Amino acid sequence: MSNYAAGLGKPGSGKRRIRDLLNQPDNRVCADCGASDPKWASANIGVFICLKCCGVHRSLGTHISKVLSVTLDEWSDEEVDSMIEIGGNASANSIYEAFLPDTCSKPGPDVNHDQRMRFIRAKYELQEFLKPSLRITSGKGSTKSSAFLTSSLSRKIMDSFRTNSSSQTMFQEGMVEFIGLLKVTIKKGTNLAIRDMMSSDPYVVLNLGKQKLQTTVMNSNLNPVWNQELMLSVPESYGPVKLQVYDYDTFSADDIMGEADIDIQPLITSAMAFGDPEMFGDMQIGKWLKSHDNPLIDDSIINIVDGKVKQEVQIKLQNVESGELELEMEWLPLDQ
């Protein structure tokens, strides 16, 4: 169980307790695609999800994912307690995505239905990213058999949460403690490299630890405008965000169109030094300086803007003949 969810286990209105859990920073985005402001939940899995992912979860059947509306449906005490005990998206994803391979990217909010379906099935129904000792497999069987297996899996995972809550460790191979969330808005690219006959079909991939997120593909566009938000959980021991741009190819491997390491330490250090940003007016609180060994085009300023800690970043893509990228980062502490 995540530390900040522990206090939600006290008696009270079920819907109020669920709403309180939903308001935690890591639950403000969909557990599966990162879409903002999810209003649905899988009560037996313990995650908050968006409307599009909700449709896929429903198609899996209630024996795999029991979907409830946070605001419209009635929740039983058992369902509420289960959600509280798991602690929300960050805790659940550290289990269900513990062994997410580098070759598999989480879908973004705007992916097509087929991509969304493939990822969610692999994550929950096929259990492809679970720790091997938690996986439960069977041959072809009935829905009743599948329901039993999924129930057994849920019990094993819940037992693991209970056991590790007391020891303060949770699946050392896959579970980490998070210190906050990093919202990255990929704004636009400029003069990107040509990888097809006369253009490219670019998309951006972000990597942090075991997390891998990507934007939508922009067809035949060397100056794409995404304005797409991606949300990363930041562990206690973090490194730079690895950014890569690829050209999407239908019949062959996607071609690299440049890369860059984004140093997030200046943002996090500045944010933690000032504490609650809502106590301050708009002001500059830090800076990531341009140097010969980083991809910055200009110094990157860190500001408090409307009670939020944000950083504008303009980078020149590395190891490629041309291309620049503009993005914005925002820091969201877990205790916000």
Swiss-Prot record:
SUPFAM superfamilies: ArfGap/RecO-like zinc finger, C2 domain (Calcium/lipid-binding domain, CaLB). Residues 15-137 form the Arf-GAP domain. A zinc finger (C4-type) spans 30-53. It holds the Pfam family C2. One of its GO terms (molecular function) is zinc ion binding. Keywords: Calcium, GTPase activation, Metal-binding, Zinc, Zinc-finger. Residues 162-280 form the C2 domain. Ca(2+) binds at residues 249, 252, 255. PROSITE patterns: ARFGAP, C2. GO terms for biological process: pollen development. The keyword Transit peptide does not apply. CDD domains: ArfGap, C2_ArfGAP. Gene3D superfamilies: Arf GTPase activating protein (1.10.220.150), C2 domain (2.60.40.150). Its cofactor is Ca(2+). It comes from the Eukaryota. Coiled coil: none annotated. GTPase-activating protein (GAP) for ADP ribosylation factor (ARF). PANTHER family: ADP-RIBOSYLATION FACTOR GTPASE-ACTIVATING PROTEIN AGD12, ADP-RIBOSYLATION FACTOR GTPASE-ACTIVATING PROTEIN AGD13-RELATED. This is Probable ADP-ribosylation factor GTPase-activating protein AGD13. It comes from Arabidopsis thaliana (Mouse-ear cress). The lineage of its organism: Eukaryota, Viridiplantae, Streptophyta, Embryophyta, Tracheophyta.
